[in-house]
UniProtKB/Swiss-Prot annotation:
Keyword annotations from UniProtKB, A to Z: Cell projection, Cilium, Flagellum, Repeat
SUPFAM superfamilies to which the protein is assigned, alphabetical: Histone H3 K4-specific methyltransferase SET7/9 N-terminal domain
Record bears the keyword Repeat: yes
MORN repeat windows: 8-30, 31-53, 54-75
Entry superkingdom: Eukaryota
Name of the protein described by the UniProt record: MORN repeat-containing protein 5
Localization of this protein: Cell projection, Cilium, Flagellum
Amino acid sequence: MEYTGSQYIGEFVDGRMEGDAEYILPTETKYIGEMKDGMFHGQGTLYFPNGSRFDAVWEKGLVVKGTYTFSDGLQYDTENWHYCDSYDRRFYTEICYGLKPAGISQLTNMDPPRKIPPGCYDCGDGFYNPNTRIVKDYNYRFLRNADDDEHEWIVRTCRKGWDETMGPEPKS
């Protein structure tokens, strides 16, 4: 653990993590649940720094069945996911608390939305800089390097930290 920056609170059997345990990763993601032979095995939950969680049944480190719950309480549904799509474009907070009056738009599930640093994108779990291809969390700590697919998705889909003129140029 000293080499990975992780922390383990629990028992060992034959030098391997085993039994009920708490495993904290360097990203501050925390696993609380059962371990066997050094792997997630049985019932366990991953708690993410942004407040979301993943409750799952694990077998030899792999998910058998699981449920992801966002920090606001919305549960991801793999079968009928219609959140913020062409079918229903409301954010979860709008579903729970109602729509704002005409003329006042809600840009994100968080209202008011986070201020995005210049040149960056808000990709849902942090800010993405397309020049460095690095995603940092909202406290500006390193999360990950984006691969080509994630870069393309973020640039195509996510909110920008700048305004763009759409349609015809306004007259001066």
